[in-house]
Amino acid sequence: MVEMALRHVYKKYDNAEKYSVTDFNLEIADREFIVFVGPSGCGKSTTLRMIAGLEDISEGELLIGDKVMNDVAPKDRDIAMVFQNYALYPHMTVFDNMAFGLKLRKYDKAEIKKRVENAAQILGLSEYLDRKPAALSGGQRQRVALGRAIVRDAKVFLMDEPLSNLDAKLRVAMRAEIAKLHQRLNTTTIYVTHDQTEAMTMADRIVIMKDGIIQQIGSPKEVYDTPSNVFVAGFIGSPAMNFFKVTLKDGYITNDGGLKVKLPEGRNKILVEKGYEGKQVIFGIRPEDIHSERVVLDATPDACVKSTVVVSELLGAETMLYTKIGDTEFVSRVDARDYHKPGEEVELAFNLNKAHFFDVESEEVIR
């Protein structure tokens, strides 16, 4: 059983003008699967390396259990880490690669054999223990790297973009493998990725970062349904949320390009009470909340817009329909049968009960 906490953690490198990580606060429950996600340079890997002890903490505290770990050596933190690079020894067999850390720690041969064979069985590597890394596929090499961490029997697993070197199909398969592995091992896991799909499919909770600052912490459903700001709303979800700068007036939102839709009474009331009547707001709506079915168009005439097709992408079961109103281009996820040629005019209905509104200046959500 292990709980972790990062309290007011900062990281600033020597001679740097800005902090790489600013006031990072997070409580992690025992056996929780936490994902740090954000664009390159947001501080997610730096934070992971501070937890591992590979980077010093400039300010703040890291606790594992009830012990402050700031000055504890990496080897004494009872942490196992999996890196983006497999870092396998090419001259060693799979068995020896997985056993290497245990040998350094002077475990006896029987215990090493037991741990390696158990990890190999979990990862489906039992028949490959005598092979060298060159004889393995990319997915098998990544499993060996995971096995090297598993044999440690550590309290905490840290994973720094472990799937980024794999092709798209293999990444999907390995996502499921890591999720199943976490359930089997019952460990606390912290996983770093720039891929929001990995974060959404694997995490118990997601920590979304930008410029070294936490933007939002929540379950995948929470960050998808109730994003805290424009950055989170645009980062989580694929395709990304559409944004329009609009003016609120007499229950309608409009823009210069010709967008005009009527808000549900409850949504309009919130915006008016917050002082946005007659002012600009950012209107966000996800592609899956824009509809082209005639039954929806007929039922919601005040939420319909006419737009011009830019391009249609047929993806089998659905079509990504890129259209524009005036100069504003947006994307809708519609039925595969709604395939249109560029230049055609189409009518679309916004599900305004699923709309999001943000302040123009702060870009924070309006609730």
Q: Which residue stretches match the model-derived regions?
A:
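A short, flexible loop at the N-terminus of ABC-type nucleotide-binding domains that lies
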Residues: 1-6, 11-23, 72-73, 106
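Conserved coupling/switch loops of ABC nucleotide-binding domains, chiefly the family-specific signature
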Residues: 58-61, 111, 211, 355
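Glycine/charge-rich catalytic "coupling/switch" loops of P-loop NTPases
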Residues: 252, 256-309, 338-367
